[in-house]
Amino acid sequence: MSGAKPFVLCLTGSLGMGKSTAAKFFAEAGVPVHDSDAVVHTLYEGEAVAAIAAAFPGTTSGGKVDRSKLATKVIDDQAALARLEAIVHPLVAKARDKFLADAQARSAPVVVLDIPLLFEIGGEGSCDAVVVVSAPADMQRTRAFERPGMTEEKFATLLAKQVPDEEKRRRADFIVDSSRGYDYARAQVRDILRAIANMPRKR
């Protein structure tokens, strides 16, 4: 391993806030981005399949996890969710550690960890700074219901499991307002990258 450790910028935001779009803007600016959700998708097609099949019979087919079947097993069952997290979280952490080591080896000055449930899992300690992507509640709702399969019940359940946006904003080092269009959000990302050049590290 060579090079200094990169500045770790953690990106988070509630359902429908535009976090994925903000992540793309960081990537456009040349920043390596680690997408936790994408890692989980990969695990559900490979490394995690056997363990999930054993813990949740009937949730896999064709060598892959059926996400909708798995969701029905865990959405209202905290014990089942804890079992799933015990399988998935260590594998996600391993992938994240490899990403950080690779970034350090390439002497990347800054990286982004895209972690949807950053505050919910108490992950702030792995960050030098936290970026929260936010938008008004009515816009959040509209975006969320553009997703396939979204229902009132599912929306309410997902929101109930997330730290409220107001609290996320309060705990953020930076906020990206995604309500004013792509160009405005992209400019905010550039401003953040300039600002962190002079920020002390927290880790």
Tell what function each PLM region has.
Residues 8, 31-33, 109-110, 124, ...:
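Hydrophobic "anchor" residues on beta-strands that sit immediately upstream
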Residues 32, 38, 129, 173-174:
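Well-ordered beta-strand positions
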Residues 49-53, 137-142, 152, 156:
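An amphipathic alpha-helix signature
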Residues 97-106, 110-147:
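ATP-dependent NMP and nucleoside kinases share a basic, alpha-helical "lid"
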Residues 125-126, 146, 150-203:
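Small-molecule kinase domains that catalyze NTP-dependent phosphoryl transfer to phosphate-bearing small molecules
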